[in-house]
């Protein structure tokens, strides 16, 4: 559960991500594919090369979902219900992959916004990403 301070940190930090969200989402995906090669199996239909238009497009989808989640911190299950259904029932993504992508996104954000990615913001963003991951795997049960 995100505290009031966590919510403040997440909203303020995501605001600083701003127009770079899609770019950072794509970079996090590329980082995940490089660091955790088995994740590529879910994207076998895509060109996974660096800078690929398909990876950029999916990075934008990731960023848009996170922007939606940031706007609904008090109701992540409601905001992400459709995505949860998609990943659980249609795509059948192994739940561990959400942790991998979360980690890679946090690394990407820390690399690009080091002055803003304070220990407190890191902790809050980690809790936020864990919450998003929990919601996305909730329909697997």
Curated annotation (Swiss-Prot):
GO biological process, one term: hydrogen peroxide catabolic process
Entries under InterPro entries matching the protein: Globin, Globin-like_sf, Globin/Proto, Hemoglobin_a-typ, Hemoglobin_oxygen_transport, Hemoglobin_pi
Coiled-coil segments: none
Tissue: Red blood cells.
N6-acetyllysine found at: 16
Single GO cellular component term: blood microparticle
Keyword Membrane attributed: no
N6-succinyllysine modification, residue list: 7, 11, 16, 40
Keywords for the protein's UniProt record, in alphabetical order: Acetylation, Heme, Iron, Metal-binding, Oxygen transport, Phosphoprotein, Transport
Residues noted as binding O2 in the record, renumbered to the chain: 58
Highest taxon in the source lineage: Eukaryota
Phosphothreonine modified-residue sites: 8, 108, 134
PROSITE patterns noted in UniProt: GLOBIN (PS01033)
CDD domains hit by this protein: Hb-alpha-like (cd08927)
Residues that coordinate or bind heme b: 87
Residue list for modification Phosphoserine: 3, 35, 49, 102, 124, 138
Domain named Globin: residues: 1-141
GO MF entries: haptoglobin binding; heme binding; iron ion binding; organic acid binding; oxygen binding; oxygen carrier activity; peroxidase activity
Role, per record: Involved in oxygen transport from the lung to the various peripheral tissues.
Family: Belongs to the globin family.
Subunit structure and binding partners: Heterotetramer of two alpha chains and two beta chains.
Descriptive protein name: Hemoglobin subunit alpha
Native source species: Dasypus novemcinctus (Nine-banded armadillo)
Underlying gene: HBA
């Amino acid at each position: 559960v995100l505290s009031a301070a966590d919510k403040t940190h997440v909203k303020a930090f995501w605001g600083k991500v701003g127009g770079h969200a899609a770019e950072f989402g794509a970079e996090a995906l590329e980082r995940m594919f490089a660091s955790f090669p088995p994740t590529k199996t879910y994207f076998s239909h895509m060109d996974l090369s660096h800078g690929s238009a398909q990876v950029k497009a999916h990075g934008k989808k990731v960023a848009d979902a996170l922007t939606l989640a940031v706007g609904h911190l008090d109701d992540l299950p409601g905001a992400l219900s459709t995505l949860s259904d998609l990943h659980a029932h249609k795509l059948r993504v192994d739940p561990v992959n959400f942790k991998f992508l979360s980690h890679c996104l946090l690394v990407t954000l820390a690399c690009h916004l080091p002055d803003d990615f304070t220990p407190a913001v890191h902790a809050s963003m980690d809790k936020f990403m864990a919450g998003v991951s929990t919601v996305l795997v909730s329909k697997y049960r």
